[in-house]
Regions:
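Non-transmembrane "mature" sequence context
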Residues: 1-122
Length: 122
């Protein structure tokens, strides 16, 4: 229940920079995934405001997905980052990275990682 409270309260805007660094992607790319215009991000970050609950949940789930992906790839960041950018048949030929803009997409990527971890096609 604490997690729900954190999501409802919101997390800092600069948490987008954290996942951006972890994925070795420009902040601009992460803003596109989360659906926040650069100008809005800059303004709200400078005012130390918090992400709304939807965006907070996405950022938290993406961060957890990164943790899981690194675990599956034995902490080999480059391999995991490459995997995120390659089309994947288990998610309809899309790249995992393109699925990160919705909770359902994140879950599909997580299922794909799970299949990979346990030796099924991913």
């Amino acid at each position: 229940m604490e997690r729900v409270g954190v999501i409802r309260s919101g997390i800092p805007y600069d948490s987008i920079e954290v996942i951006s660094r972890r994925l070795n992607n420009p902040v601009k790319s992460m803003l596109a995934i989360v659906g926040i215009p650069q100008t809005t991000y800059n303004k709200k970050k400078s005012e130390h405001l918090l992400l709304d609950s939807r965006d907070s949940e996405l950022v938290i789930l993406i961060n957890e997905l990164i943790d899981y992906g690194l675990e599956v790839f034995n902490n080999e960041e480059e391999k995991f980052q490459r995997w995120l950018k390659k089309p994947n048949l288990s998610i309809g030929g899309s790249t995992p990275e393109n699925m990160l803009d919705t909770v359902t997409g994140i879950n599909e990527v997580k299922f794909s990682l799970n299949r990979l971890e346990y030796g099924n096609l991913a």
